[in-house]
Amino acid sequence: MKTAYLLAAFAPLVGAVLAGFFGRRIGRAGAHTVTILGVGVSLVASLITFADVMAGNTFNGTLYAWSVIGDIRLEIGFLVDTLTATMMCVVTFVSLMVHVYTIGYMEDDDGYQRFFSYISLFTFSMMMLVMSNNFLQLFFGWEAVGLVSYLLIGFWYTRPTAIFANMKAFLVNRVGDFGFALGIGLVLAHFGTMDYAKAFEVAPTLAERTIQIIPGTDWSLMTVTCICLFIGAMGKSAQFPLHVWLPDSMEGPTPISALIHAATMVTAGIFMVARMSPLFEMSDTALGFVITIGAITALFMGFLGIIQNDIKRVVAYSTLSQLGYMTVALGASAYSVAIFHLMTHAFFKALLFLAAGSVIIGMHHDQDIRNMGGLRKYMPITWITSLIGSLALIGTPFFSGFYSKESIIEAVKYAQVPGAGFAYFAVMAGVFVTAFYSFRMYFLVFHGKERWMQAGHGHDAHAGHDDHDTHDDGHHHGLGPNDRPHESRLVI
């Protein structure tokens, strides 16, 4: 099975290198062929791994030792269990769909090969993060995901808004990563190892240990370590108050919005807390902190979604709210439920983002939902996909979101940690808020009067915001007086 693990992790990297360094030589078709092939191989290897794990086999081993410093070993290794196998399948499947979608979405872009190289590199970084068996490799995967997201958010680097957005994402995540690095430093200093298994084995003996952050005051080592690690998750998974970078990340092309928000960067923090669950279970204070932050994010980001008029920003704030739900589940010690919602959310949120991209193309790059209406008649396939995604998002019975959200609400109801009462109120209220902003967007876009006839122009259609998911090259944005919305190409 080691071959399958290596293929799953490194096949996207091979595609990224070929498309990045030899993109001009192999051309557009060559670039998307090698990257899609790489991610496809990774998906097949991930499915084989998942089947093997379901058969009861797990793996925890070292591939390569970088260095040995005293008793501390710095290694590259894989830990493959149920959590890892699930994340591998989610990441590779959504990434493959985004790669295929990109063929149509970016067909006229000058940076076509560069974009395919970036999204494959993004997939590789996330695979190394989820498959790691030690804190050092986790940190490198963590930072690699952040670096590539910086490159992707600022993909159209000639636009000042894109440069501002990627710098904002980079700097806000540095705040979270500082806490994350402190947490790893505490693990190294007090646990004496970077290996997950050894750290979890030592943890019970350190449950009562205290440290002095401020002279004369004792703080629980486990609480401080867990909160520092969670601050890292607050940055990556865009939890309040470190959520501010994520709406601006809409400056990147729509395919990467789907990849960042559905399967990769923003789920890294949720995955990390679930992986560190043996440590978090030793501190009720840390769990109370997690559940409170998650509850605030779940409710108030939903409120912000109600007042957005940019179609991608509505879906972005929806992502923030749903990440809050996952964090609440983590705080309630329902780790499997959090990962379940992560998995279902990855699929329906990617669907919603890709449908939003289809709407943007059909509307000639107008993103303001106030200028839409009645698109169901012109974009029937996009309409039905948006409806399916919206029904799953609000938790309609028999759709995937219903089962995962229901599980979260039930877990919070019986949680005993501090802040559980507020969290229960927040997730219950959030159900109604989610339904409101989801169907506000759905009805404004696909039903009602055809308002683009009233707009009758391109640039003014963007009044009130400057989120244009297209190049800053001066071509026509929005529908002209003689234009009509149209369905996207089949590949999209």
PLM segments and residue spans:
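...captures the hydrophobic TM-helix bundle architecture rather than a specific catalytic motif
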Residues: 1-492
